[in-house]
Amino acid sequence: MVPRAVSEASRPELHALVVEDSPMMRQLLVFALARVPGLRITEADDGVDALRKLAGQRFDIILTDINMPIMDGLKLVRRVRADAAHKDVPIVIVTTESAEEDRKRAMALGANAYVTKPIQAPRILEVVRELLKLES
């Protein structure tokens, strides 16, 4: 059975985790995601902060930068994929790293999508809606 798109108005609340060390970039992502009705957003400054938040909550999607202090986004992807409780949560990499080998590496580690900065709200929304199987 193929999953069908769900109307945003008729689905249960969804929860996104935005992991970005730059407060300005994090706010741009939050602003873009705020256009998805009923999407609750939690923010994290880096991979370690994200893992703390993942330990106590359920998330439906994770958006993460790669280049962050303490724990980068690729290490976060590895850790999330190794955790049985979160291994199937879609992960979107949002980064300035635009080389094809960077994208391939992230996807090989388990990312579901790779979006390069500068952040374009329509592109972020398209990817999130596709991964969450929401109607546009």
Residue ranges of model-derived segments:
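Acidic, metal-coordinating helix/loop segments flanking the phosphotransfer/catalytic sites
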Residues: 43-61
